[in-house]
Amino acid sequence: MKINKYNALRFWEECYGSKQYAEDFHGNLMCKDGYGNNNFSVNYYGQEIYCGWNIHLILPSACGGTNAKSNLLCTNIATNEEAGDRITFWIGESLYQVKRIYGTRDHEIIRIE
């Protein structure tokens, strides 16, 4: 999938339907209207919550990952930046690792600590 705003919003709808808000794999909030916006936030009970999002490659391209839909996730921009192009990474106090799904060519992100 070519990653651009149009395709990203279609991918959001495939993943979350008509929902305006969702959480990424780390639990960070995303707002559909915040695609690609580093400064997008909402006020929730008087607290500003950053919820811009973009597309994350589960298996980074540097490790052989592609833009196939099975290798993509919607993630909060902060989550994506923390994960970077690594297959083992920390976000806060959580350690994650990209693992191959047994019997397939697909990968997933697993919290290991």
Label each region the model flagged.
Residues 2-52, 76:
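Short cysteine-rich loop/turn motifs with clustered Cys
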Residues 9, 29, 57-59, 72-73, ...:
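Generic detector of leucine side chains in alpha-helical contexts
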Residues 27-31, 75-78, 92-99:
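Solvent-exposed, non-transmembrane amphipathic alpha-helical segments
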Residues 34-75, 83-88:
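Histidine-centered nuclease catalytic patch
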Residues 63-70, 81-113:
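Polybasic, low-complexity binding patches
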